[in-house]
Amino acid sequence: MTFKPLDPVTKYANDVVKGKILAGNDIILASQRHLDDLERQDTNAFNFHFDVELLHKFLAFAALVPDPDDGVPKPLMPWQIFILGSIIAWRNNKTGGKRFRRAIISIARAQGKTYLASIIAAYDFFVQSYQKSNQDILLSANTTDQTKKLFNYTKATVELMLNST
């Protein structure tokens, strides 16, 4: 079934599955899963839904997140929107919580993994943890040096956002 691309995540998934966007097998499978799950989301047997309204709110927030290297927000590419939207917009029907609580993002060096992680961390810190106390955000990487880089990058992102208000 082909869905009318109401949102950029579904449009990207459609384009990947149709072969309009060249992608590896894992992205093709993730795109097909997204489309299959959209079909199942209104059935009793499937406990999740794709929240398009939340996706648009998240993308509006992401458009404000500055890159600490120059202090300017970077426009997200369609593949980045697909990854972030898949993580953020799939929700549990009963709890409203995230369907995916962990994500492994494997991208070549210098392609923006740290920026994507900082967007998610900033969103969790500013939006999803709003009016909650004692919230923890876990940042991890393969090495201590990578974890420090991610922490410092995310810290700089949050500081830029706090100082811009």
Labelled PLM ranges:
Residues 2-165:
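Phosphate/NTP-binding elements of NTP-utilizing enzymes
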